[in-house]
Amino acid sequence: MLAVAVLAAGKGTRMKSNLPKVLQPLAGATLVERVLASARNLRPERRLLIVGHQAERVEQQLSAVDGLEFVLQQPQNGTGHAVQQLLDPLANFEGELLVLNGDVPLLRAETIDQLVSTHRSSGAQVTLLTARLDDPTGYGRVFADEQGAVSSIIEHRDCSEEQRRNNLTNAGIYCFNWTALAEVLPKLSTDNDQGELYLTDTVAMLTKAMHVEVADPDEVNGINNRQQLAQCETMLQERLRHHWMAEGVTFVDPASCTLSEGCQFGRDVVIEPQTHLRGRCQIGDESRLGPGSLIEDAELGRGVTVVMSVVREASVGDGVCIGPFAHLRPAAVIGNNCRIGNFVEVKKSTVGEASKVNHLSYIGDAELGASVNVGAGTITANYDGVNKHRTVIGDGSKTGANSVLVAPIQLGNKVTVAAGSTLTKNVPDGALALGRAKQLIKENWAGPQG
């Protein structure tokens, strides 16, 4: 059996934020959510999150995570003290305990799998993750033989000059035999410079220790300040882009684009510079996004073009052209082969197949049929100051430029609305609707003379 414990109680004072450090966002997810996800493939029987600073806020953020147990550490007195809080919740547990840090979000699932499998096959009481650093200053050094057996861990300040040449460091991630660990946890001492209980001290108390060296030291980078958060964002974005380029996606200027882990792309998608995808996005084959676009929690079909536009929580069919400077807001549903042009906003509306809203229009709380042509400057006036109302436009209808449709209103199929009309009443199929003042011409009118 396996239990996973994530240390998430720290204050993160160097972040200088009102938000708990483990809830800082990174490529569309919080730090601690990424850590929890990295161990998902192991299918642990128990998952425990050790909380402390702003515990209620952390618990609220993660309340939807199935099977996650919250354990309070109060006060926060070191990593050893944090794991001591598991003695009661895991009193009857037998198996391995994997200890992860809530502020180390780049750790790969494959690395964790290797750590746990090595621990199980070696018969060790503890297996720790290690990393070779170009500059190990300040890190505890791990001394081990060629078979991976750890003889000692010595803090940097206690190392001799020769020992400091060893750049194998402790990453602070462990897999323990829980029964063995539970016996030594009460023996931890605060006899150190910080007056805290260190989980590292348990390694010397256990009979057999092994280590697994991480292939990429960047995986175990911890985040303590905004600079490190930005560095991890850069590394994670590069990882995501490399993954999707290997799957057939083209990035014209990779470094200028950002993704979230929830994005999915078909083949031959092209992403132009300064394009950003957030949340859960589904992008169909041969679509072209950007330049200068934001797409968030949206579903786009095959062969969609989005140019300098914003698409949020919308569903877009195949072959749709969007932009430039269009805005699809939540609950916009655009049918196949539509055109949503420049300075058009669509909110909570359905636009039927092959319809065109080409210029300077607002479509809100509306239902447009197939092959509708919306003239430049057409507005669906959906709000009466208290309530929103719907506009329905039938198949094959067209509105002239600068028309206002005052909802609630329904236009039948193949209706024509004359330019400049303001309509307040329903229009039957095939009718021409005019709602404007009669044009007057006064000849020989020179106007006021100054």
Curated annotation (Swiss-Prot):
Task: List, in alphabetical order, the GO biological process terms annotated in this UniProt record.
Answer: cell morphogenesis; cell wall organization; lipid A biosynthetic process; peptidoglycan biosynthetic process; regulation of cell shape; UDP-N-acetylglucosamine biosynthetic process
Task: Write down any Gene Ontology CC term.
Answer: carboxysome
Q: Where is this region: N-acetyltransferase?
A: 248-450
**What is the top-level taxon of the source organism?**
Bacteria
Principal place of residence: cytoplasm
- Entry annotated with the keyword Protease: no
Active-site residues are: 359 (proton acceptor)
Instruction: Give the UniProt keywords, A-Z.
Output: Acyltransferase, Cell shape, Cell wall biogenesis/degradation, Cytoplasm, Magnesium, Metal-binding, Multifunctional enzyme, Nucleotidyltransferase, Peptidoglycan synthesis, Repeat, Transferase
Summarize where acetyl-CoA binds, as residue positions: 376, 382-383, 419, 436
Which cofactors is this protein said to need?
Answer: Mg(2+)
What compartments host this protein?
A: Cytoplasm
Catalytic class of the enzyme: transferase
| Pathway connected to this protein | Nucleotide-sugar biosynthesis; UDP-N-acetyl-alpha-D-glucosamine biosynthesis; N-acetyl-alpha-D-glucosamine 1-phosphate from alpha-D-glucosamine 6-phosphate (route II): step 2/2; Nucleotide-sugar biosynthesis; UDP-N-acetyl-alpha-D-glucosamine biosynthesis; UDP-N-acetyl-alpha-D-glucosamine from N-acetyl-alpha-D-glucosamine 1-phosphate: step 1/1; Bacterial outer membrane biogenesis; LPS lipid A biosynthesis
| Binding note for cofactor | Binds 1 Mg(2+) ion per subunit.
Q: Does the keyword Glycoprotein apply?
A: no
* GO MF annotations, alphabetized: glucosamine-1-phosphate N-acetyltransferase activity; magnesium ion binding; structural constituent of carboxysome shell; UDP-N-acetylglucosamine diphosphorylase activity
Subunit structure comment from the entry: Homotrimer.
Name recorded for this polypeptide? Bifunctional protein GlmU
Organism listed in the record: Synechococcus sp. (strain RCC307)
